[in-house]
Amino acid sequence: MNIHSYLKKIIFYTYTAFVIFMYTRPVTIVRQLELASGLDLDKMFHFLTFLLLGVFAQLNNNIKNEYTYVISLALIISCLIEFTHFVIPYRNFEILDGVFNIIGCITGIIIVYYYRKKI
């Protein structure tokens, strides 16, 4: 394994752990920002977080046109995070959050697809 491949794996796994950690905390920074600004930022952050997860996962995926791995990963992580919200104080299960997670991940896959196509 070359250093480039190793770094991609480290970035992907670190980011995935960070996402799981942040989404399973009782109070999030996003919620604090929403309260301070009066804006609904939750869905945008779900989309952007999983867009990055999709990009990192697809770049880490050695099979260039294989998308089931990344989509499955997004579904599993999204479901895991949303179902843990049943038991975490001050968190709510929202199906729309899961939808934005998946849309973000698929958008990340599309970005990597076009990036690789140009190279």
What is the meaning of each model-derived region?
Residues N60-I63, Y67-H85:
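Membrane-embedded catalytic cores of phosphoryl/pyrophosphoryl-handling enzymes
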Residues M1, R116-I119:
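Short, charged juxtamembrane terminal tails flanking transmembrane helices
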Residues P26-T28, F45-F47, I81-I88, I111-Y113:
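Juxtamembrane membrane-interface segments at transmembrane alpha-helix termini
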Residues R31-L33, L39, I81-I103:
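Interfacial helix-loop-helix junctions of multi-pass membrane proteins
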Residues F56-N62, I111-R116:
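Structural signal for the C-terminal ends of transmembrane alpha-helices
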